[in-house]
């Protein structure tokens, strides 16, 4: 019978989740062995199992081959045995014939001893020797007992049938042997029919027995042996009486021996046949097991192939992620190279600046040399003046005057010298400038002269060209000289020539005048050009000076900017220090906040267009959210399913559950192919848990048959979601429907899709988680910073240790391809464990976690600092395996004992002692650390002062009342910043034990709570933590009401709660009576609200409140509520039969115990049971009318009250018979008021340890109380401190 196996039965998650098993393995059949899920086996284990199965298969094959060989050998032996059996049957057929002949002739053998019968007897003996007698099962008896004759002597003898008797029974098989009787025997039998009648009948009976024994498997050896022994009697022919008897006896002995041998051979053959049957059966079983192993091997191979495909997909995804990381690193490398290039350019600029710096240094050296020379000259001048003053014979007072005058003169001369040096410097600068200008002017003048010479030469050349050749050698003379020369010449004929010459001269004069004009113009042009050049030079000098000034201004501006930049960096560092001191986010965290709180930019246009069924407004989705859609389309049921349903048109519907949502149900549909067409849409928050669910888990889908008002499950199937991560398109699939008995009842069509890609949504979700963590720490830091302002400066512990966990670098997750969500945990001295905030999905988390530990310097603390080390563990919030951590670092504390701070990076090692990043830690004292030996004398002095104040106790009690430094040191103190114990004086008298227990019980409660929680609840807790638990409204101490721990603060809720308070609470009466004793219960119960309940379902007893004119403000009242009480099972109170009923009371200034005790006594709670009182008391603290109560509270806060800053609750036993027994105090519980003042938060149902009156260190139970007093305590403390300082 073939068993159906669920194809998705192997798709188990790698890591089991504690909440809901996501995958249920399908049944493999009844005979199948339960195997471990293949998804939890790695590749090596699968290969080992595969090779093991292969070796087993080969061994089974070899065994089957050996069995086949053995079967062949057995077959040959069987053929041999069948042949031998045929021979034996022939001999057995011949034996009865001889026996009947022997019986018939027995009487005649003794009388007739003729010789003609001897050959016949010899023939019979030869026949027996040839064929051999049948081997009997047992030895033949020697005495002839005779046999029953089947036929009469006269009856005819029937012929022997060839195939056996026809009248055999129906359940016997026909004989399968052939007759091997010889012709000779047949002749003898035919010749003597009368003698062999009984023999033939015995042969027929023996053959029928043999034919019946063969199909049974030769399992009747005894009967065959008996029949063979009964039929193996052969009579010999008669002989002579002398020789017949001894031969008869020998023949019988030989025949008995031969029959015994044949019977042994038959037994052996039967045993061999039985062994052969057993081997055949074993072979059949082995073949069946081999078939089963082959089927298992095929299943293992298929599972291995599917697992290999999944692993290849995972490896491909990891490879793609690695490639993306490589690309990102390449981009970062390019950016870093660009930064390096810019830094190189800046370095070149720095080299230029270094050169200029060297020049300035040289100038400074020159100035220093001049300064040395001036100092030397001054010293020489001073020495000369002193020598001249010493040589003169003036009185001592005149020398002093002279020295003063000389000093004045020297100072004046020095001033003059300095002024002259400055003038000299100015003159030298002006001289250098003038020299430069002079050189420039000289160059310009030489250039102008050269140009002028060139122009003159050009003009002269032109003039020589214009004169006649005979006159070129004569110098140009004045016209008057020429005129005189012409007058000297007397001859008149030369007048014409003179006229011509005069004309030429006039022309020359005109040309000369033109030339002179041109030269003047040229000179004017040159002068103008010189002026222009001078202007240009002045402008150039102005531009140069302007450029120098600009350069100087630019350098000054750069220096100023660098100074401003340094100042800005210093301010940033100071602000970061302030932020770290107040636990506010730093710049890196603010960047994460900025990127984590900005809206997610999704390009909806790039997404594929969907059909008409998209009716969801995607814009309503928040950042980090995604929309998952699952559509159930249609089912196709088989005939087997319809037969199981008992209806050809069944009415069915489907149910399924997805992730942590509720179960969805499709509408009803009728028919063998029901069409559901139902879509479920889930708004998911993309995180690692959801991603893991989609990758590894599957959802179960059930098809139910509806019958009237009832329904029954018809079939079930599984839907896997891993393919939806690959695309944003619709992913269609078929789910196989399996019935309750494992039959296949059909398939179901469905599709699913994610609206947005999973990777950017996951990144946005991680950034948002980081932002919310940083914002929550910002709110905490702001609250702590404001709490610092309200803390009293009058009290401080002896010292305070600051421990800061700054950041971690290079953390690696235990799972490849994932980012850890780390947080750090450590324990200092005897304090409780302190853990940091959880930074989601970060390899380099910034914690900025600061913790302050107020300590008393004792020898134990000093020994701890000198011998021990601070062990810091870093855990991964996503790792669910217990005992695993990312890394551990050990910080030696010896420098703290030497009053030195500790700051640096410490290596983290994983459980295998391999490095896994580093952690930056800083430890520092608030005050200088002084070893405990220096406190011995001040301690004695304080003890002496306290003994003077306590005058009502004896000296022995007084010595016992003052604790030592070790006793004053709290073993555990709340480690949240801003929560310190109030400074108290040593307790007086008998309350020493109570005070010591108060410290122990207070330290036993763990106040710190990690911000991160598992999975989806972490985000809910963060939102509640920001909106409700840690808002700045808590620090302002205004509008604070009792509320549930998970309720939100709103106006409507406040109004509603104020109305409830108006109906359920009231102000206390103004009491002016003295404090009543403890056992006084006869006073009336006034102004209180009581509700008594043995269990949560019991009735409440309510005392109606007193009416009041107006509701009191929170700063004018306080409300104390006793909620419930429970005892530990091992406490002595539980075994004390005298304690039947208990009630709770407390003392408060002038209020009588009748108002502060629970009005109803409840029976003692059983083991593990909690009784509820719900007794609340509103105490009036009006500033004008109740100054005494306000002063009482201030004294408690300031440590001046005997109660030492806590409110004491007493659990009292109320006897049933009040006449015979009195009330007895059972235990005490203490509530710290400083805790409320420091934290600024009211206490809501806080559990207090109840201690025994005999042993204050032994808790016997817990008392749950609530106290609304934050606003009034803050107002009283502020008011009283202002009155003290004013």
Swiss-Prot record:
Mutagenesis or variant effect for residue 1121 to A: Nearly abolishes interaction with RPGR
InterPro entries reported in the protein's UniProt record: C2-C2_1, C2_dom, C2_domain_sf, RPGRIP1_C, RPGRIP1_fam
Cellular component aspect of the GO annotation: axoneme; cilium; cytosol; intercellular bridge; intracellular membrane-bounded organelle; microtubule cytoskeleton; photoreceptor connecting cilium; photoreceptor distal connecting cilium
C2 domain span: 781-906
Keywords, ordered alphabetically: Cell projection, Ciliopathy, Cilium, Coiled coil, Cone-rod dystrophy, Disease variant, Glaucoma, Leber congenital amaurosis, Sensory transduction, Vision
Tissue distribution: Strong expression in retina, with weaker expression in testis. Expressed in other neurons such as amacrine cells. Colocalizes with RGPR in the outer segment of rod photoreceptors and cone outer segments.
Main subcellular location: other
One Pfam family recorded for the sequence: RPGR1_C
Effect of residue 598 to Q: Found in patients with primary open angle glaucoma and juvenile open angle glaucoma; affects the interaction with NPHP4
Effect upon mutating residue 635 to G: In a patient with normal tension glaucoma and a patient with primary open angle glaucoma; affects the interaction with NPHP4
Family: Belongs to the RPGRIP1 family.
The protein's role, per its UniProt record: May function as scaffolding protein. Required for normal location of RPGR at the connecting cilium of photoreceptor cells. Required for normal disk morphogenesis and disk organization in the outer segment of photoreceptor cells and for survival of photoreceptor cells.
Entry's disease: Leber congenital amaurosis 6: A severe dystrophy of the retina, typically becoming evident in the first years of life. Visual function is usually poor and often accompanied by nystagmus, sluggish or near-absent pupillary responses, photophobia, high hyperopia and keratoconus.
Protein name: X-linked retinitis pigmentosa GTPase regulator-interacting protein 1
Protein species of origin: Homo sapiens
This protein's encoding gene: RPGRIP1
């Amino acid at each position: 019978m073939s068993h159906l196996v669920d194809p998705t039965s192997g798709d188990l998650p790698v890591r089991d989740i504690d909440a809901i098993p996501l995958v249920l393995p399908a049944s493999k059949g009844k005979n199948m062995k339960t195997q471990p899920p293949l998804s939890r086996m790695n590749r090596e284990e699968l290969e080992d199992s595969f090779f093991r199965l292969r070796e087993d298969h080969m061994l089974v094959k070899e065994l089957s081959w050996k069995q086949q060989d053995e079967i062949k050998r057995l077959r040959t032996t069987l053929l041999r045995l069948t042949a031998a059996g045929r021979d034996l049957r022939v001999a057995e057929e011949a034996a009865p014939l001889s026996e009947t002949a022997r019986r018939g002739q027995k009487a005649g053998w003794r009388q007739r001893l003729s010789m003609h019968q001897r050959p016949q007897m010899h023939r019979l003996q030869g026949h027996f020797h040839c064929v051999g007698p049948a081997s009997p099962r047992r030895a033949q008896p020697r005495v002839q007992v005779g046999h029953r004759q089947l036929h009469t002597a006269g009856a005819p003898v029937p012929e022997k049938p060839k195939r056996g008797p026809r009248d055999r029974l129906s359940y016997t098989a026909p004989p399968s042997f052939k007759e091997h009787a010889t012709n000779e025997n047949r002749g003898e039998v035919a010749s003597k029919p009368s003698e062999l009648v009984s023999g033939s009948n015995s042969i027929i009976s023996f053959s029928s027995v043999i034919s019946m024994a063969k199909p049974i498997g030769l399992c009747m050896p005894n009967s065959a042996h008996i029949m063979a022994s009964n039929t193996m009697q052969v009579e010999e022919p008669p002989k002579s009486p002398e020789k017949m008897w001894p031969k008869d006896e020998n023949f019988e002995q030989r025949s008995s021996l031969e029959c015994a041998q044949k019977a042994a051979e038959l037994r052996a053959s039967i045993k061999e046949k039985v062994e052969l049957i057993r081997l055949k059966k074993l072979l059949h079983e082995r073949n069946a097991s081999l078939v089963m192993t082959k089927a298992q091997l095929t299943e293992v191979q298929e599972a291995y192939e599917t697992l290999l495909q999944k692993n290849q997909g995972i490896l491909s995804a990891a490879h793609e992620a690695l490639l993306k990381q490589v690309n990102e690193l390449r981009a970062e490398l390019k950016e870093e190279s660009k930064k390096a290039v810019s830094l190189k350019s800046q370095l070149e600029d720095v080299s230029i600046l270094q050169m200029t710096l060297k020049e300035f240094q040289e100038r400074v050296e020159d100035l220093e040399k001049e300064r040395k020379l001036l100092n030397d000259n001054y010293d020489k001048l001073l020495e000369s003046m002193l020598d001249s003053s010493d040589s003169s014979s003036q009185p001592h007072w005149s020398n002093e005057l002279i020295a003063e005058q000389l000093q004045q003169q020297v100072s004046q001369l020095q001033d003059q010298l300095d002024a002259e040096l400055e003038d000299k410097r100015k003159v030298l600068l002006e001289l250098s400038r003038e020299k430069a200008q002079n050189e420039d002017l000289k160059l310009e003048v030489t250039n102008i002269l050269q140009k002028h010479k060139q122009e003159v030469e050009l003009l002269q050349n032109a003039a020589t060209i214009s004169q006649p050749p005979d006159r070129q050698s004569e110098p140009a003379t004045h016209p008057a000289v020429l005129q005189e020369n012409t007058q000297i010449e007397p001859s008149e004929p030369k007048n014409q020539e003179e006229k011509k010459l005069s004309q030429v001269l006039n022309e020359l004069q005109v040309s000369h005048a033109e030339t002179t004009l041109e030269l003047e113009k040229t000179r004017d042009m040159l002068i103008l050009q010189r002026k222009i050049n001078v202007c240009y030079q002045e402008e150039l000098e102005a531009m140069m000076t302007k450029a120098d000034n600009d350069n100087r201004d630019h350098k000054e501006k750069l220096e100023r900017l660098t100074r401003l930049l340094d100042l800005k960096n210093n301010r940033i560092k100071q602000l970061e220090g302030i932020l770290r001191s107040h636990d506010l986010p730093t710049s890196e965290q603010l960047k994460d906040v900025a990127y984590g709180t900005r809206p997610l930019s999704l390009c909806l246009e790039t997404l594929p267009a969907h059909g008409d069924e998209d009716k969801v407004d995607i814009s309503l989705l928040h950042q980090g959210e995604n929309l998952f859609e699952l559509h159930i389309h249609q089912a196709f049921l088989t005939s087997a399913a319809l037969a199981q349903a008992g209806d050809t048109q069944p009415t069915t519907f489907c149910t399924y559950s997805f992730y942590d949502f509720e179960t969805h149900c499709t509408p009803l549909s009728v028919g063998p192919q029901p069409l559901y067409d139902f879509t479920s849409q889930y708004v998911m928050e993309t995180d690692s848990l959801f991603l893991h669910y989609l990758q590894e888990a599957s959802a179960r889908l059930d098809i139910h048959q509806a019958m009237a008002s009832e329904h029954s499950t018809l079939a079930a199937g599984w839907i896997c979601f891993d393919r939806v991560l690959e695309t944003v398109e619709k992913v269609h699939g078929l789910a196989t429907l399996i019935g309750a008995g494992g039959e296949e009842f059909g398939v179901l069509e469905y599709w699913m899709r994610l609206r947005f890609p999973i990777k950017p949504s996951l990144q946005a979700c991680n950034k948002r988680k980081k932002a919310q963590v940083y914002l929550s720490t910002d709110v905490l830091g702001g609250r702590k910073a404001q709490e610092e302002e309200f803390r009293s400066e009058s009290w401080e512990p002896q010292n305070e240790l600051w421990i800061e966990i700054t950041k971690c670098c290079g953390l690696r997750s235990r799972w490849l391809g994932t980012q850890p969500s780390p947080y750090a945990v450590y324990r200092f001295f005897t304090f409780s464990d302190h853990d940091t905030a959880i930074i989601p999905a970060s390899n380099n988390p910034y914690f900025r976690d600061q913790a302050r530990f107020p300590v008393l310097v004792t020898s134990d603390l000093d020994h701890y600092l000198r011998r021990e080390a601070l062990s810091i563990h870093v855990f991964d919030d996503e790792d669910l395996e217990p005992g695993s951590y990312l890394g551990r670092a050990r910080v030696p504390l010896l420098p703290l004992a030497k009053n030195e701070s500790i700051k640096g990076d410490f290596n983290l090692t994983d459980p295998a002692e391999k490095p896994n990043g580093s952690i930056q830690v800083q430890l520092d004292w608030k005050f200088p650390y002084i070893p405990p030996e220096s406190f011995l004398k001040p301690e004695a002095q304080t003890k002496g002062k306290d003994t003077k104040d306590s005058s009502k106790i004896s000296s022995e009690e007084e010595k016992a009342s003052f604790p030592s430094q070790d006793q004053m040191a709290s073993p555990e103190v709340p480690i949240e910043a801003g929560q310190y114990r109030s400074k108290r004086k040593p307790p007086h008298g008998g309350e020493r034990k109570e005070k010591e227990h108060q410290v122990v019980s207070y330290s036993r409660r763990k106040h710190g709570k990690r911000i991160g929680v598992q999975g989806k609840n972490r985000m809910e807790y963060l939102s509640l933590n920001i909106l409700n638990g840690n808002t700045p409204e808590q620090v302002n101490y205004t509008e604070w009401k009792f509320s549930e721990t998970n309720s939100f603060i709103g106006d409507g809720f406040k109004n509603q709660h104020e109305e409830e308070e108006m109906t359920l609470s009231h102000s206390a009466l103004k009491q002016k009576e003295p404090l009543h004793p403890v056992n006084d219960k006869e006073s009336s119960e006034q102004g209180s609200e009581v509700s008594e309940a043995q269990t949560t379902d019991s009735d409440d007893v309510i005392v109606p409140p007193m009416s009041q004119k107006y509701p009191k403000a929170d700063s004018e009242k306080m409300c104390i509520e006793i909620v419930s009480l429970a005892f530990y099972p091992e406490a002595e109170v539980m075994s004390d039969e005298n304690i039947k009923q208990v009630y709770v009371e407390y003392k408060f200034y002038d209020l009588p115990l009748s108002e502060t005790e629970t009005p109803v006594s409840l029976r003692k709670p059983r083991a593990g049971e909690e009784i509820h009182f719900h007794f609340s008391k509103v105490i009036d603290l009006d500033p004008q009318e109740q100054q005494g109560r306000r002063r009482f509270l201030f004294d408690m806060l300031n440590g001046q009250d005997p109660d030492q800053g806590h409110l004491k609750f007493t659990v009292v036993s109320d006897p049933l018979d009040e006449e015979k027994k009195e009330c007895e105090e059972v235990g005490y519980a203490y509530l710290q008021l400083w805790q409320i003042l420091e934290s600024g938060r009211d206490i809501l149902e806080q559990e207090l340890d109840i201690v025994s009156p005999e042993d204050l260190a032994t808790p016997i139970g817990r008392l749950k109380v609530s106290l609304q007093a934050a606003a009034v305590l803050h107002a009283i403390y502020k008011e009283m401190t202002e009155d003290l300082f004013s």
